[in-house]
From Swiss-Prot:
Protein name per the record: Tryptophan 2,3-dioxygenase
Subunit-structure text: Homotetramer.
Organism of origin: Pseudomonas fluorescens (strain ATCC BAA-477 / NRRL B-23932 / Pf-5)
Keyword Oxidoreductase found: yes
Matching HAMAP family: T23O (MF_01972)
InterPro entries: Trp/Indoleamine_2_3_dOase-like, Trp_2-3-dOase_bac, Trp_2_3_dOase
Length: 283
């Protein structure tokens, strides 16, 4: 019969485990669990609000890791050090996969349950997530208008303004292709970093050359596939976002003032790496 893990006389196999943490760092200390687990403050009396809060808090934690990986990967691409970037981009793709599955947990909330907590949310909305906005900026989907929801937080606004003015991951990849001898229109290389990524024929032609000769451009070829994998996972996350929101609130407006599902459906048309998708039709 197994012994209770909280017994004062632990089983023999526990004898080498540290059990006294009065003078050393414990698991909870290292992870700062005291603050993390006390950061949930439901405003309504409804049981289901805890799910809503934790769903969004954990998403923000995963996005923090995404930003950590994306910024490092972008710097490696800028320096032409692609192998380290591959691991980081693969990790971001798997984080998106994790977030795709997480929607299934929120989808256990019914319309009636959400209706009970919605009045307590005010105008707070995932649309206002500054981390999500920075992820989009790093990946090339930029719009200065999307800085406005953060104007009331000068420190966040300053960070996002710096992010939108910094070349995107894809900009750095295109610059690397030019340095690798592939022909890129100088106008594309001189493009204002604050603009969103648009299709460029010279970039598509360069990627076509890479895909036609993968052994000659192996690292760029691998980078292209990492980008495709990342955007594929991102698209799945966006789609699952739409279906989860529609399942819970239908076509009601979002709390942040957007069209709700209508707005999210428009976001499904966003393409981060347009030439990489277009080139597949001409190989």
């Amino acid at each position: 019969m197994s012994q209770c893990p909280f017994s004062s006389n632990p089983p023999a196999e526990w004898h080498n485990a540290e059990l006294n943490f009065s003078d050393s760092m414990s698991y909870g200390d290292y992870l700062d669990l005291g603050r993390i687990l006390s950061a949930q403050h439901p405003l309504s009396p409804d049981h289901n609000e805890m799910l809503f809060i934790i769903q969004h808090q954990t998403s923000e934690l995963w996005m923090k890791l995404m930003l950590h990986e994306l910024k490092a990967a972008r710097e490696h691409v800028r320096q032409g050090q692609l192998p380290p970037a591959f691991k980081m981009l693969a990790r971001v793709s798997r984080i998106f996969d994790q977030l795709v599955h997480a929607w299934a947990v929120l989808a256990t909330m019914t319309p009636s349950e959400y209706k009970s907590i919605r009045p307590y949310l005010g105008q707070s909305s995932g649309f206002q997530s500054f981390q999500y906005r920075e992820i989009e900026f790093i990946l090339g989907n930029k719009s200065a208008a999307l800085l406005r929801p953060h104007a009331h937080r000068p420190e966040l606004l300053q960070s996002l303004e710096a992010s939108i003015a910094t070349p995107s991951m894809y900009d750095e990849a295109i610059a690397l292709m030019a340095r690798s001898g592939l022909s890129i229109d100088p106008a594309r290389l001189a493009l204002d970093s604050t603009t969103t990524t648009q299709h460029d024929p010279s970039v598509e032609a360069a990627w076509r050359e890479v895909y036609a000769n993968p052994s000659a451009y192996w690292d760029l070829y691998q980078l292209a596939e990492k980008f495709i994998d990342l955007e594929d996972s991102f698209r799945q996350w966006r789609f699952r976002h739409v279906t989860t929101v529609e399942r819970i609130i239908g076509f009601q407006p979002g709390t942040g003032g957007t069209e709700g599902v209508g707005y999210l459906r428009k976001m499904l048309d966003t393409v981060l790496f347009p030439e990489l998708w277009r080139v597949r039709s001409s190989l």
